[in-house]
Amino acid sequence: MVKRNQRKKSAPKKRLTKAEVEKQRAIKRMILSVLMALLLIFAMLRLGVFGVTTYNMIRFLVGSLAYPFMFAWLIYLFCFKWLRQKDGMIAGVVIAFLGLLVEWHAFLFAMPRMLDQDIFLGTARLITRDLLALRVTEFVGGGMLGALLYKPIAFLFSNIGSYFIGFLFILLGLFLMTPWDIYDVSHFVKEAVDKLAVAYQENKEKRFIKREEHRLQAEKEALEKQAQEEEKRLAELTVDPETGEIVEDSQSQVSYDLAEDMPKEPEILAYDSHLKDDEASLFDQEDLAYAHEEIGAYDSLSALASSEDEMDMDEPVEVDFTPKTHLLYKLPTIDLFVPDKPKNQSKEKNLVRKNIKVLEDTFQSFGIDVKVERAEIGPSVTKYEIKPAVGVRVNRISNLADDLALALAAKDVRIEAPIPGKSLIGIEVPNSEIATVSFRELWEQSDANPENLLEVPLGKAVNGNARSFNLARMPHLLVAGSTGSGKSVAVNGIISSILMKARPDQVKFMMIDPKMVELSVYNDIPHLLIPVVTNPRKASKALQKVVDEMENRYELFSKIGVRNIAGYNTKVEEFNASSEQKQIPLPLIVVIVDELADLMMVASKEVEDAIIRLGQKARAAGIHMILATQRPSVDVISGLIKANVPSRMAFAVSSGTDSRTILDENGAEKLLGRGDMLFKPIDENHPVRLQGSFISDDDVERIVNFIKDQAEADYDDAFDPGEVSDNDPGFSGNGGAAEGDPLFEEAKALVLETQKASASMIQRRLSVGFNRATRLMDELEEAGVIGPAEGTKPRKVLQTN
């Protein structure tokens, strides 16, 4: 019996089969899955203390993404076999989830309350607070796992960069989860865009056909109605019983019918240089009233000034800029200018009739049905207004500019498609002879308001109307054009127009002329703040003086309680009327730069900064700028300058690139020169073509001598830029420091103190740009403070402190 028991104990155990082992594993996995699912369900529903605590423990790991995490884990527990069959599905979900953790944590640490906290400690503190209090209230981002991922990413790419990195993770995860790759997505997007474009085009064609059907139906109904009215009219006519004829003038009826059948001939408007048109301003009466309000008599702003809280004006207001009044000053008259000779452009009419036929035949040869409705003969170009037939695309006509120039044997053709405010297309063709528009002729026809001191007659439009603009509305003007295009003549015309209307105590000029020949004639007139600046190095300092004056004026306005120069001068007038102690009104200031490109080569940073500040703030202070350049490239007219000088005047340029730099569109490359311009004011979407006025050097000298005979120049020392030397620091082509940097000693002391030398250290410690830091390194090497560069090795410091 004992032996049998021993034999029974020593018998080997039966080995389980593979199927039995797999079954046991499946049972264990099922039990664990069910237990895990129950745990997750308790956590998701937050049932009792156990559920809240479990949920907070999961939040400690993945933060506020606990619900998506638990939901994904439940799917994995019961569908893991199916998920394993999908290539990349699990990896894609994990990578996308990590991206979401980074996004959630970046959002958490973008909150103001988390900006200065440590990433790990701040996250743990938020979660622990809820965990101990048995609650779920705080937003905890991506939990500790999110903090672990976010910290290095934020260190390398900042908080904003973390959003992009997280988005890339999510995008990569989506690509892994789906069978698509980047090429499939791009192909899908391209096909979708193509389908939308085709559908849009088909819908557009259907709408066009429907409109045409409605139009034809309306025409048919109109013809039927006209036929019925004609039958009714014939039925009511009186018939002579003897002759059987209708008692009506049949001859006139026949001639009327023939006139109806004959094609209407285009209207041709000849250019008359002495025709005085009432429409003499580029702006309507409302705009002129606004300009009058801003700069003229200041009547409309008196109510605004009186509505402000009255301030104590007994104390004298200190004004740095106090020009003298000129009580006996007389304004120049137009008689100073030589009368212009009448222009004979009679032969242009015959040429226009011929060109109308050529235009229609040329369009017909290209299969385009058009009709010339009107032709306006201007001083330099003739504008043909054509009406295309229904269904003709505008760009088909615009693309024929070169073909039209060939057919008309013209120098160039400019197409305005369409004309603003009209359902017509304008074709501008140069005249065989250009009629010069004199300054006197333009002044006599402009009817400019004498109270608007900065309203300037600019030129004549294609229809011969004199056009003017108010610099106070612009409020700054950019003038650009190649040599010989009429840019300097236009600037002289603007200056002369202001001198014709303003006394020295009303308007002051600061003129900058690096070429030294364009504006020097205005030296010693009483309107100048300082003599004409010809040194480019002084120009930047002079512009800075104007910036300082602008700031002083704003401080003065703030102290008085007014918003602009008009309100201040109104307050001064009211104070002077009621007090024996007189205050001096502030004059307007016009800054004129004749060649901006030369200034930008010498001191680009200082000049650009001053121009930008004046462009942004100077209008209310009564300061306006006119910037002229013959090289309209992007390195001269930067984007910031263009943004702050909204009004543009473009003369003939050499390329379409220059035209786009000035006007943001083509057109200036097709101008003829000699005063032919495109003017685009601040409140116009499209430029207006004008023929600028011509003012000779003799005319300028006469008006300058007339002014000099009445008053002497009274320069203001507050605007004097002082003397500058050739080695003056701070002036170089790129706006950095020139040779002999004033920070050399400070950089040397820094290197000797730290016994380290690198451009990045100097850039960081001295707050300078990289270019200036490298130049300081070169100067330190030349002075023997540091050794030469040795590849990637740090430089040796050769001196000690």
UniProtKB/Swiss-Prot annotation:
Write down the CDD domains for this protein, in alphabetical order: TrwB_TraG_TraD_VirD4 (cd01127)
Q: Which GO terms describe its biological process?
A: cell division; chromosome segregation
Ordered alphabetically, the record's keywords are: ATP-binding, Cell cycle, Cell division, Cell membrane, Chromosome partition, DNA-binding, Membrane, Nucleotide-binding, Transmembrane, Transmembrane helix
Q: Where does this chain mainly localize?
A: membrane
Q: Which domain of life is it from?
A: Bacteria
Q: Which residues lie on this side of the membrane: Cytoplasmic?
A: 178-801
One MF annotation (Gene Ontology) recorded for this entry: ATP hydrolysis activity
Q: Can you give the residue ranges of the FtsK domain? A: 464-660
Chain segments carrying region Disordered:
720-739
GO CC annotation, single? plasma membrane
Q: Does the keyword Aminoacyl-tRNA synthetase apply?
A: no
User: Which InterPro entries would you find in this protein's record?
Assistant: AAA+_ATPase, FtsK/SpoIIIE/SftA, FtsK_alpha, FtsK_dom, Ftsk_gamma, P-loop_NTPase, WH-like_DNA-bd_sf, WH_DNA-bd_sf
User: Which ranges does the record mark as transmembrane?
Assistant: 31-53, 58-80, 89-111, 131-150, 155-177
Q: Where is ATP bound in this sequence?
A: G484, S485, G486, K487, S488, V489
Domain remarks in the Swiss-Prot or TrEMBL record: Consists of an N-terminal domain, which is sufficient for the localization to the septal ring and is required for cell division, followed by a linker domain, and a C-terminal domain, which forms the translocation motor involved in chromosome segregation. The C-terminal domain can be further subdivided into alpha, beta and gamma subdomains. The alpha and beta subdomains form the DNA pump, and the gamma subdomain is a regulatory subdomain.
The protein's assembly and partners:
Homohexamer. Forms a ring that surrounds DNA.
Q: What does this protein do?
A: Essential cell division protein that coordinates cell division and chromosome segregation. The N-terminus is involved in assembly of the cell-division machinery. The C-terminus functions as a DNA motor that moves dsDNA in an ATP-dependent manner towards the difSL recombination site, which is located within the replication terminus region. Required for activation of the XerS recombinase, allowing activation of chromosome unlinking by recombination.
Protein name (database record): DNA translocase FtsK
